[in-house]
Structure formats: structure tokens, C-alpha cells
Amino acid sequence: VGAVMPASTSNGIETWRLRTSKEQWIRWVYWLIGIAIIMYAWQMISEKTVWFFVTDAPSQAADIASRMVPPKWSYMDKLWKPVWDTINIATIGTIIAMVIAVPVAFATARNTTPNLIVRTIGLFIIVSSRSVNSLIWALILVFILGPGILAGTIAIGLRSVGFCAKLIYESIEEIDHTQVEAIEATGASGPQKMIYGILPQVLPTIAGVGIYRWDINIRESTILGLVGAGGIGLQLNGSLNTLAWTQVSLILLVILVTVFISEWVSAKVRGAII
């Protein structure tokens, strides 16, 4: 006897039908394949894991935690500039990303792209940017430009282009076309339709995406210093290398407060815009 499974009719009302034996077998095969993959992955992880360190991890964590308390508050004087650098990396990187992302989005959206070739190039830029993590961009740029906040800023910008452009071009494709048609009926040119028909509809999205990405970039820029790309992560890396745990705890607290404030600012600004 086949199992009962839900199905939807054309008018959206949920009905029920029996699952055939073939469908049941296919379902069981999928389950078995999934279980086999999980078991194989667990076996590979187990073979490459030193379980002594895993079992000893709680005591090691407790030991490190005890060394991190209390934080070295006097070290705060050396953190103000790295925090400011982190904010600058995120802010300037986001601005660079938005300057590139907006034209890429208009070139990629189906209703604004000049032709298929331009759209393909736009999609390639978006995918390339989204495929590479900001830490990898930072590593590459540190080798090219040397360590410092310039490498971190450009890394944040390159990583953010794809994220921002994707959200913006999807918003462009979902605009109300009646406004554009009304402007077109007046004999407006292509640029005029873009400026008066499309851009006003997507401006809130552009602003919202920019603020949202800035919030994300604050968090990402805190760790770029681990690869030499400036910011407070550079101080964190130095403290970790010297086992200065009281400094590490203070840096983590500063990062936590910075991220919390950036999220609060982002939420307030986006709430006012959207």
C-alpha cells in the first residue's frame, strides 16, 4: 500500500494522494545515499582527528579562560586607532563597492541591460566577487600591495560588489513597469526613463543594501588583520602570537561592542530609509 502524501491542486487547495511504490523506493534510496555520505564523511573526519586534543579541549579552554580574566584595561589606549582603522576599512570599502555595484546591477538586470553580452559580463563580475572570501582577497592584496589598511579596504570592496549588485539588480527587475510605461508614453528617451522611472523606485533598495553591507563589513574587517590587512585584527593576531590572553579578552570585548553598535546604527538607518 502506498504512503499518503500532500499535493496541491491548481486552485491552491491542499489535497492528499497515495505515494506510489516507485516513489517510496526512490525516497528510500535518497535517504540511504544521504546516510552513506554522512557516515563516509564522519569516518574521514575521525581518521584525521587527534582525539586526545578533543578530549583535552574542555580543560584547555578553561585554562585559557582563566588567563583572560580580568581584561587588561590599560591596553585600551593602543586599540583606539585600530578600531578607527577597522571602521574606515568597512566604510570606504563599502563606498567603493557601491560605486561599482550600482552600474553593474543596471547592466545585469534584464529590463535595463543593453544586450546579452553586457548582462553576461555583469553576472560574471557578481559571481566572481561572491565566490572569493574577503580573507582570500586580503591575502592576495597583501602580497601585491603590502600589509596595511589599503589592502583590507580593497578586499572588502571587491568582496562586497557581488553581494550588493545581486540584491540591487533583483530589485530593478521587480520594479513597477507601469511607471516606466507612463514616462515612455510622453516620448522620454532611454536615459530619462532610467532617471525618472526606474531609479526612484530602487533608490531605497540601494541605500538599504549599502547600509546593510556596511554592517556586515564591520564584522568582516575585524578579522582582516589576521592576514596583515590592517584593523583591530592585527592587534588580535599579535596578542595571540605572544599569548597575551588579558589583551585578547579586551580586544574581543572591543570587537563585540563595535559590532553591536554597528548593528544598532544599521538597523536605525535602514528603518528610516526603507
PLM features: residue spans?
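N-terminal, non-cleaved signal-anchor transmembrane helix
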Residues: 1-95, 102, 107, 111, ...
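Membrane-cytosol interface at the C-terminal ends of specific transmembrane alpha-helices
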Residues: 147-213, 264
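Alpha-helical membrane-interface segments at transmembrane helix boundaries
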Residues: 80-88, 122-129, 211, 215, ...
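Cytoplasmic-entry segments and transmembrane alpha-helices of multi-pass inner-membrane transporters
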Residues: 104-138, 167-170
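Hydrophobic positions within alpha-helical transmembrane segments of bacterial inner-membrane proteins
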Residues: 94-102, 106, 110, 135, ...
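C-terminal transmembrane helix and the adjacent membrane-cytosol boundary/short C-terminal tail
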Residues: 249-274
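Generic hydrophobic transmembrane alpha-helix motif, especially the helices
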Residues: 126-160
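Loop-to-transmembrane-helix entry motif
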Residues: 23, 72, 86-94, 125, ...
